[in-house]
């Protein structure tokens, strides 16, 4: 089974501080409660919880007190489902603008997620047009992340 939850409204090109002051506590409480609830019910070890976005944010505040889209660095949080507890991988430079240590690409994230979910990431599927398509194009399983 898979559940996808969307908590939108994070596209803060302006007034990022005011927006975060309202949104971040709501998100923190919901995320912490979900992890705690899954743990209390004995479900966390077999449930992968992931928080991500499709891109990061510019390292510097823009002219309207916000941040714009930035593809070079962003964070992902993963819990349960065979992931190490408290593990932090990689680092950005001092400005948060470029990878500084141990960069990971989307294909690495996908391949790792598929591994813990028991999905063969090497499998090819056929497109509607009859063309074979790799589930993941390249990438590596991030074994350091696994419990």
Predicted regions located by residue number:
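Ligand-binding pockets and gating/stacking loops
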Residues: 1-147
């Amino acid at each position: 089974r898979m559940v996808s939850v969307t908590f939108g409204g994070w596209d803060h090109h302006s007034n990022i501080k005011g927006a975060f002051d309202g949104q971040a506590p709501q998100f923190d409480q919901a995320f912490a409660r979900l992890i705690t609830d899954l743990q209390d019910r004995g479900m966390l070890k077999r449930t992968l919880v992931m928080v991500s976005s499709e891109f990061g944010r510019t390292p510097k505040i823009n002219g309207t007190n916000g941040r714009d889209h930035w593809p070079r660095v962003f964070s992902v949080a993963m819990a349960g489902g065979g992931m190490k507890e408290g593990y932090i991988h990689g680092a950005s430079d001092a400005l948060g603008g470029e990878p500084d240590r141990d960069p990971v690409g989307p294909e690495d994230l996908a391949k790792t997620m598929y591994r813990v979910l028991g999905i063969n990431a090497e499998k090819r599927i056929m497109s509607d047009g009859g063309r074979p398509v790799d589930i993941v194009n390249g990438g590596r399983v991030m074994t350091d992340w696994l419990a």
